[in-house]
Amino acid sequence: MTITSNISVQNDNLVVQGKTILTKIPDNIILTPVTGNGFVSGSFIGATFEQSKSLHVFPIGVLEGLRFMCCFRFKLWWMTQRMGSCGKDIPLETQFMLLESKDEVEGNGDDAPTVYTVFLPLLEGQFRAVLQGNEKNEIEICFESGDKAVETSQGTHLVYVHAGTNPFEVIRQSVKAVERHMQTFHHREKKKLPSFLDWFGWCTWDAFYTDVTAEGVDEGLKSLSEGGTPPKFLIIDDGWQQIENKEKDENCVVQEGAQFATRLVGIKENAKFQKSDQKDTQVSGLKSVVDNAKQRHNVKQVYAWHALAGYWGGVKPAASGMEHYDSALAYPVQSPGVLGNQPDIVMDSLAVHGLGLVNPKKVFNFYNELHSYLASCGIDGVKVDVQNIIETLGAGLGGRVSLTRSYQQALEASIARNFTDNGCISCMCHNTDGLYSAKQTAIVRASDDFYPRDPASHTIHIASVAYNSLFLGEFMQPDWDMFHSLHPTAEYHAAARAVGGCAIYVSDKPGNHNFDLLRKLVLPDGSVLRAKLPGRPTRDCLFADPARDGISLLKIWNMNKFTGIVGVFNCQGAGWCKETKKNQIHDTSPGTLTGSIRADDADLISQVAGEDWSGDSIVYAYRSGEVVRLPKGASIPLTLKVLEYELFHISPLKEITENISFAPIGLVDMFNSSGAIESIDINHVTDKNPEFFDGEISSASPALSDNRSPTALVSVSVRGCGRFGAYSSQRPLKCAVESTETDFTYDAEVGLVTLNLPVTREEMFRWHVEILV
């Protein structure tokens, strides 16, 4: 069978479905279609060079007049988003790019379908490719090994290009095509998600930073539990390990970041976590902390922090008891793209002091001994931080890709051996060296940290996690980070976590909590109502700039089992500045913005609605409490000030008869209200002809008689407690919970049925709710 592609080079232009995407393609550029039978949607861009070198920077064509969004590393550890329309707008260290164009084969002008084209720079052999732009509007590839001894004169599969009409499916299929080609990583859908995701958690970091102690852990768990939101997973962050005590060097120019050169001197816990009661010398202090958390506070999962290199400054060479890891001082060398973006205090420190790098041949032994000790203490997993440091240490070791892959493979092998629940959170890890080497790790931090004391950071954080999740969410479930429940932006952050599909955890100091807020996220049993997918921007937000353009709201969509959810956020006023190379507020008083939502903003709503869906929906707005019957194709307007939000739950309308329709809403006082719905079943219960009336059902329509014969029994399984809501076009004849008739209220103006579900002692309990209509 002949292979045909919708991506080709014609007259020195890169053409996608009839539309020129890039012009002036150089002669040394090679286009290779994906292998396979029939029509293919993807091709690889490669190149040949006159000289063999360890670093090549070269153009692949000119981009002008097409909107794009990209994810780029603004500093070594983290990505954020950038929007533009020409090559010079593409930042250094761009690892993902999505372009918008029109299909000029299938239509003309505005009638032509929109085509979305993904560019994924890849790893090839010992080299890594990234994109960047120049002042000529050329897209360049920066192709490097990170080791001057590792050279090449060609690369045949440097960037994968994939196109189609659904942007989310295009991204998904492009990563899956690269997975088949590279065979070095797995797509998120193939990975086991750790169970902690469905439980509320607490992290010690912003509560104590490195001053965390055993007593502090106990205080934090106790404080949250007493307020009715018990943490079921715990992260003991940086501060528990044995590290060297270094006096500051008076002659060292780098002082502020001196802590980052500190090295690990033992795999066990430090003195702060040692037992004060030494009656049982066989039990470690860390084990006592974990046992206390699980037995006294009913915590299910405990994770411990460590850096990929052991600690920020690695493992101290020849440290007592750690000699067998063959740690040696190495000095980081950053890639040109990273150096062109934001400087980092960690790297300033390590450039002076060096990092104690465990011999790559011994790194599995290091991880295995560390993790087996942690597992013996009852630890269930690890948060592995500072990962991208490894890419800077490849000189003399085969380069950045080889070194990163050896560390990642050793890490995943140790986690598989020691932690049965695939217990790993990957952090400070936004490089493709690691992403394209991860076959097992299933959780990735989605952005730079939550910074409670930085006013510029909060809108930036929400925008970054959403756009980064477009790319990262194909590899792992994005983690949108901890936040503070008692904070001026707490509700804004909480609402974002509800639509993010991510773990929900806080870093509150003991006693500093907003329990009214937390109870909108956390059920009394400590579980959470988590959306099912990575939260991502809606289609109409993909190429807008909701942090900088002054006009756009950010809309984030996700799915529950039977509904969609769309969160809308005003994120204007701050962003990463390419001139100052840091986050900054560029508008101190961003204006009030107006936008709208539609049912199909939740991109997969038709899949949960079923084949017989008319397109009409019931929309529940969480903050306002409004219930709206939304016809197919219609929209709901909204207005938000900066740092304001709204959550819309979209429930496809189920037509029971010509004049009776129904839609579940869920627990109306929870942020992710419709995430409580576990099942819905509608059974007709009469053969009699139901009463009919002429005209469309609306608030002005006459109600059917309460003495009518029942038409259908709607059965809904609901997880959680509190006020349960549903839409019914007619007042129900009766409602029951666990087969016992219960009181309910009915607002005939909007069709809202509400009833109360009691608290139960059983975890993850599902109430059986019956509504007779």
Swiss-Prot record:
UniProt EC number: 2.4.1.82
Inducing stimuli: By oxidative stress.
Enzyme class: transferase
Gene3D superfamilies named among the record's database cross-references: Aldolase class I (3.20.20.70)
Top-level taxon: Eukaryota
Key words, A-Z: Carbohydrate metabolism, Glycosyltransferase, Transferase
GO MF annotation: an example: raffinose alpha-galactosidase activity
Keyword Phosphoprotein: no
GO cellular component: a single term: plasmodesma
Catalytic activity: alpha-D-galactosyl-(1->3)-1D-myo-inositol + sucrose = raffinose + myo-inositol
GO biological process, one term: raffinose catabolic process
Family membership noted in the UniProt record: Belongs to the glycosyl hydrolases 36 family.
Function: Transglycosidase operating by a ping-pong reaction mechanism. Involved in the synthesis of raffinose, a major soluble carbohydrate in seeds, roots and tubers.
Protein's name in the database: Probable galactinol--sucrose galactosyltransferase 2
Organism annotation: Arabidopsis thaliana (Mouse-ear cress)
Gene this chain is encoded by: RFS2
